[in-house]
């Protein structure tokens, strides 16, 4: 099953973040699916998929997208949901600045309206420019935004930290955003 891991990982991401109904399932209130049900559902498209395959995909996922509960009977995505789930995250004070990588085609709208979560449950922010760069390159011509997270927090905006170290918030008003000059960054 190893040669299909990338495809299956994307499929798992789709199921756990957006469309569990693709395999006839529904996430619980905390975003979990029963592992055996997920494996059975995946087998409808990828015959022979097993618990060993799932554990390997979770373990080898460089972005740390998924986590099991303690006894590995349930699994969920750590963030990125378009479905409302309670991840049990607690408010936490962020570092002074965070970063958001995006494509130049979105810059005008962001500078006018701020960062809006759209179909996602939260805005995703990175603790460093390198991670923001990796994320942003997926959206075309790279732009890295610096977010004054300390001022946001001091002004009452809540921040959360996902299990895989992605900073989350509901909205980033435009006054806290600054475009970085990439020549100075790298």
From Swiss-Prot:
GO terms for molecular function: NAD+ poly-ADP-ribosyltransferase activity; tRNA 2'-phosphotransferase activity. The keyword Transferase applies. InterPro entries: Ptrans_KptA/Tpt1, RNA_2'-PTrans_C, RNA_2'-PTrans_KptA, RNA_2'-PTrans_N. GO terms for biological process: tRNA splicing, via endonucleolytic cleavage and ligation. Pfam families: PTS_2-RNA. It is an enzyme of class 2 (transferase). Keywords: NAD, Transferase. Gene3D superfamilies: 3.20.170.30, RNA 2'-phosphotransferase, Tpt1/KptA family, N-terminal domain (1.10.10.970). Its EC number is 2.7.1.-. Removes the 2'-phosphate from RNA via an intermediate in which the phosphate is ADP-ribosylated by NAD followed by a presumed transesterification to release the RNA and generate ADP-ribose 1''-2''-cyclic phosphate (APPR>P). May function as an ADP-ribosylase. Belongs to the KptA/TPT1 family. This is Probable RNA 2'-phosphotransferase.
């Amino acid at each position: 099953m190893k040669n299909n891991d990338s495809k299956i990982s994307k499929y798992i991401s789709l199921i756990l973040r957006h469309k569990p109904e693709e395999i006839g399932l529904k996430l619980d209130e905390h975003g979990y699916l029963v592992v055996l049900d997920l494996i059975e559902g995946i087998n409808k498209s990828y015959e022979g998929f097993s618990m060993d395959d799932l554990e390997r995909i979770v373990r080898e996922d460089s972005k740390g997208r998924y986590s099991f509960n303690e006894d590995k009977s349930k699994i969920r995505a750590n963030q990125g949901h378009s479905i409302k789930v309670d991840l049990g995250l607690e408010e936490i004070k962020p570092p002074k600045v965070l970063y958001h990588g995006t494509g130049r085609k979105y810059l005008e709208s962001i500078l006018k309206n701020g960062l809006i979560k759209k179909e996602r449950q939260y805005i995703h922010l990175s603790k460093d420019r390198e991670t923001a760069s990796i994320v942003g390159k997926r959206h075309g011509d790279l732009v890295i935004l610096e977010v004054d997270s300390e001022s946001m927090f001091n002004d009452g905006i809540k921040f959360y930290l996902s299990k895989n170290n992605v900073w989350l918030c509901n909205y980033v008003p435009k006054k806290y955003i600054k475009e970085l000059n990439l020549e100075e960054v790298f």
